[in-house]
Swiss-Prot record:
Name of the molecule in the record: Large ribosomal subunit protein uL24
GO cellular component: ribonucleoprotein complex; ribosome
Alphabetized Gene3D superfamilies for the sequence: 2.30.30.30
Organism: Bifidobacterium adolescentis (strain ATCC 15703 / DSM 20083 / NCTC 11814 / E194a)
Gene behind this protein: rplX
Quaternary organization: Part of the 50S ribosomal subunit.
Keyword field: Ribonucleoprotein, Ribosomal protein, RNA-binding, rRNA-binding
Sequence similarity: Belongs to the universal ribosomal protein uL24 family.
InterPro entries: KOW, Rib_uL2_dom2, Ribosomal_uL24, Ribosomal_uL24_CS, Ribosomal_uL24_KOW, Translation_prot_SH3-like_sf
GO molecular function, a single term: structural constituent of ribosome
Annotated function: One of two assembly initiator proteins, it binds directly to the 5'-end of the 23S rRNA, where it nucleates assembly of the 50S subunit. One of the proteins that surrounds the polypeptide exit tunnel on the outside of the subunit.
PANTHER family: MITOCHONDRIAL RIBOSOMAL PROTEIN L24
GO BP term, example: translation
Length: 111
């Protein structure tokens, strides 16, 4: 199955303690979790390393499950579901079928 949420997408949190916050996806993990910029901030205790990093408490983004976020439609600026549409394109003199992500509310292609 093609990925409906990719890194770089603008998403809105729809469930959890950060409900309503928006951010861009920094990383997509294999277990259906995402790291979203500015969302799900937790404090992590870090040891000092020999390379000069100091010990202390650091705020980092924790993963959030993909079912708790929705992609923001670039045209309407509202959360929307994503469809996968197959369309044919001519490349190098051949017609190839390409899968494209499309916002369900506006029908526009997602980058």
């Amino acid at each position: 199955m093609a990925a409906k949420i990719k890194s770089g997408d603008l998403v809105k949190v729809i469930r959890g303690k950060d409900r309503g916050k928006e951010g861009t996806v920094k990383q997509v993990l294999k277990d259906d979790r995402l790291i979203v910029e500015g969302v799900q901030i937790v404090k992590k205790h870090v040891r000092a390393t020999q390379q000069g990093q100091q010990a202390g408490i650091v705020a980092v983004e924790a993963p959030i499950h993909r079912s708790n976020v929705m992609v923001i439609d670039p045209e309407t600026k509202q959360p929307t579901r994503v469809r996968i549409v197959e369309k044919e394109e001519a490349r190098d003199g051949k017609v190839k079928t390409v899968r494209v992500r499309v916002a369900k509310k506006s029908g526009k292609e997602l980058a």
